[in-house]
């Protein structure tokens, strides 16, 4: 099979950067930083298809797209980095994320790549969005290892800056 048709067989290089400015004149983001080792990334765009009918048959179809929601599963994120991207407070002296119940996540950009086939890649860049969630759990140790991962939701929206 031609390499450009290869299946997705992996994901890596998950990076994030806080957006400094998103205006009609400028789009400026911090230097991207490695977010965490990625296990799975699944995305779905919110779409709406509206057909119009004339003379008793469909004549046209109008398609709109809303935000894209990505569910990102990683091995774990350092507490300071999780607080930074989830818009929570971080106490560097104790290493604790302080959850006040009022997150204020910054707009940020993310990028990653899917492995395609044996040695190809498909690169993704979402230029603006926010993280939410931070689903995490732990269980008591036992004679079996019970591995738990960390799950984030990234909701991508349009930039103000026109490309």
Predicted regions and their residues:
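Oligomerization/assembly interface segments of phage tail-like spikes and tubes
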Residues: 57-81, 146-159
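N-terminal "mature-chain" segments and other terminal, solvent-exposed stretches
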Residues: 37-38, 45-55
């Amino acid at each position: 099979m031609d390499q450009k048709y290869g299946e997705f067989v992996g994901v890596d290089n998950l990076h994030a950067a806080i957006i400094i400015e998103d205006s009609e004149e400028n789009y400026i983001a911090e230097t991207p930083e490695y977010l965490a080792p990625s296990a799975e990334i699944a995305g779905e765009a919110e779409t709406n298809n509206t057909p119009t009918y004339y003379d008793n048959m469909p004549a046209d179809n109008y398609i709109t797209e809303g935000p894209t929601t990505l569910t990102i599963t990683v091995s774990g994120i350092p507490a300071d980095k999780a607080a930074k991207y989830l818009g929570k407070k971080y106490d560097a002296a104790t290493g604790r994320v302080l959850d006040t119940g009022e997150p204020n996540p910054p707009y940020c950009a993310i990028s990653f790549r899917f492995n395609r086939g044996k040695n190809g890649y498909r690169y993704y860049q979402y230029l603006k969005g926010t993280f939410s969630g931070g689903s995490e759990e732990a269980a008591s140790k036992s004679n079996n290892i019970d591995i738990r991962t960390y799950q984030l939701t990234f909701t991508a929206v349009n930039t103000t800056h026109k490309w």
